A protein has these predicted regions:
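A C-terminal functional module that forms or caps the active site or interfaces directly
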Residues: 167, 175-178, 182-194, 199-200
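Active-site rim beta-loop-alpha module in soluble metabolic enzymes
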Residues: 117-180
Length: 255
């Protein structure tokens, strides 16, 4: 039986083998990671979310962000496999040769993919980061007509710009495209159907890797004695701000 938590993207759950239950464990720190300051805050939020997922019985955890918030801390704290979408996506993209990153966010947020490329030694293999948004989108993220909802439903105002960026990257010699945000997961198949080179959905790559690692691991739970302290830290700021960023740890469990 496959059970999909409504908060987990259906395109991911539907493609996984039967017998897998996906659940979402959102970061309780609601700050949108527009700068390295909020990114550091999300590392703590994701650590706490991962601890909760592991304690609830998850067999693996996926960081639902290419920023891979708190990945080192999560791996140190959890006894279960932890996979970052950024790490998994880059690995898959690099396997095809020279690649480009297409992101729905403005240039001011390129510190996220740039840091990821440095960490994994792939700066030279990446032909470039293509941004399809202007800075003003950061002022209109929330709401029914907000930017995130337009991304999630692959609105033409976003999708057409993404596809144009993909075509520019191909003209520059890209042999694969990595989507620069897991929020683009819902449009990944549509993009792939309209282009001639592989389109890497980092969230899907991470989910596949997590399932494989969980099947080969018997470990469960956590391995840190700091879980309560982490929760007290998050409790102090939880609910203080809600900037409509659905960042979370997606956990895999097995029936």
């Amino acid at each position: 039986m496959r059970t999909i938590n409504p908060a987990v993207r259906p395109e991911i759950g539907a493609a996984l083998p039967s017998g897998i239950e996906l659940s979402a464990w959102p970061s309780r720190i609601g700050a949108f990671p527009a700068t390295p300051v909020e990114m550091a805050m999300q590392a703590i939020g994701h650590l706490e979310a991962g601890l909760s997922a592991a304690e609830a019985g998850a067999h693996a955890a996926v960081i639902d962000s290419v920023a891979d918030y708190g990945i080192d801390a999560l791996r140190a704290a959890l006894a279960i496999p932890v996979v970052g979408s950024g790490e998994a996506g880059l690995t898959a993209a690099a396997g095809h040769g020279r690649f480009a990153i297409i992101t729905v966010w403005p240039k001011s947020m390129n510190f996220v993919p740039e840091q990821l490329l440095r960490q994994h030694g792939l700066e030279a293999q990446c032909l470039g980061i293509h941004n399809v948004a202007e800075e003003g989108v950061l002022d209109a993220i929330a709401g029914p007509d907000g930017y995130l909802n337009r991304i999630n439903r692959a609105d033409r105002s976003v999708f057409d710009k993404v596809l144009a960026a993909v075509n520019r990257a191909i003209e520059e010699g890209a042999q694969a495209i990595m989507l620069g945000c897991t929020c683009m997961s819902g449009m990944a198949a549509k993009i792939a159907a309209n282009t001639s080179i592989p389109v890497i959905n980092p969230l899907w790559e991470a989910a596949k890797m997590a399932v494989a690692l969980a099947h080969s691991s018997d470990s469960t739970g956590i391995k840190t004695d700091r879980a309560d302290l982490v929760r007290r830290m998050v409790n102090a700021v939880a609910g203080e701000v809600d900037e409509n960023c659905p960042v979370c740890v997606a956990a895999d469990e097995f029936d």
